[in-house]
Amino acid sequence: MMSLQQNALQFNSKFSFDFSGGNLSSDSGLLFIKEFIYKIGFDNLLNQYFGADNRKIHSVSSVIEQLIYQNIAGYHRDDAADHLRYDPVFTAVLEKEALASQPTISRTLNSFEQKDIDKFNDILEHLYKMTHNPLDKRHIILDLDSTNV
């Protein structure tokens, strides 16, 4: 059994982690999120559905991925992108020298059409099918709440 003290991340073997101290970052938990996203192939799904664009620096899929990480880390406003643009954890996780700026994010979001919303729905459906097995009926979970009647 592996312990957390001796591990490397699969999405980028240059990263390893231990809990013996050193430089701290309040956003370093994103490395574990990146590992999860890598293992389920979510980044490949984004590229499959949104990867065919001609933007040179920040593709639609990379802007979406950046927004996902920003929200997971608690940066819910798109103007946080300007403060995080060169953050070492974010640039490492997104594998970029610089993140998309707030205006780039706004332009990307404002360019979405119904076909893009349909792509998001397809991604959600794919993730659901990946994680849900209707034939697995060994466990039934009943969520019961008490009520005052």
Q: What is the predicted function of each stretch?
A:
Residues 1-149:
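Dynamic "connector" segments at or just before major functional cores
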